[in-house]
Amino acid sequence: QSENILGYFFNVERIPNSCSDSPNRIFLKDRKILLNISTAYYRVNISAYNEAGESPQALYIVPEFSATDLPGQIHVKHQGTNAVVTWTPEFNPKCFVVDWGTGKEDMHMKIITTATGNFMLDNFQPYKLYKIMVHASDVCQCESFIRHEKTFGVTRFYFMEGVPRTGPTNVTILNITKHSALVKWNEIAVEDRLGFLRGYRISYIDSARKKSLAVTLNSSTTSYHLTGLKEKTIYRVQISGFTGAGEGPLTLSQPFSTPKYGTV
């Protein structure tokens, strides 16, 4: 029963935990705790206890932090099958801790004790978005970094970019008039981009197979106002996304028809 709870066990574990430390276990009387942690991934387990024993644990993954106000800039470039990460230290900790991977289930960790400001990483695959984090720490032995590390910088990186595997989804045509229409779409999902999405290209084809000039839009745009359409004409819109590697497949809208009469 909740009224018989004597306290809580709170375990926090860094991901990845390459030192194979047991999680930090904290005993709490209250149902809140303030942690000063880095932007690394953390796994939290919480259980309650009373005179009869301990409850099952509730598992929680600390969500990703915004990395807009970090002090350092990280740069990544290819070198053969590896990537070289460089940064300019603004202070001199005893070591840097580097995390890299595609997500919390696929993170690697390395402790760097030299003050060179660069490091070579491996284990990269093409067409996958990697997150690279550099943390400064005054503790460099194989022990918990939770109380000691501060994030210096975070960046995202594709070892090799590809073209998007799909086009935008849910392309819809709204507000159709004699000479205009509004096109809306859902952005290409991150896992389908296979590279940094640079933008979209949109054009339309009429019933005579006459194609308009393509308009290039930035990657944050998810709507476009078509103008210069002919009245009483059937059109289809086509949209594709593109990365640094090129343009992906087209998504075609359902046909729509402009009216003969009505507003312009």
Q: What residues fall within each predicted segment?
A:
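Extracellular low-complexity, O-glycosylation-prone stalks/linkers
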Residues: 1-264
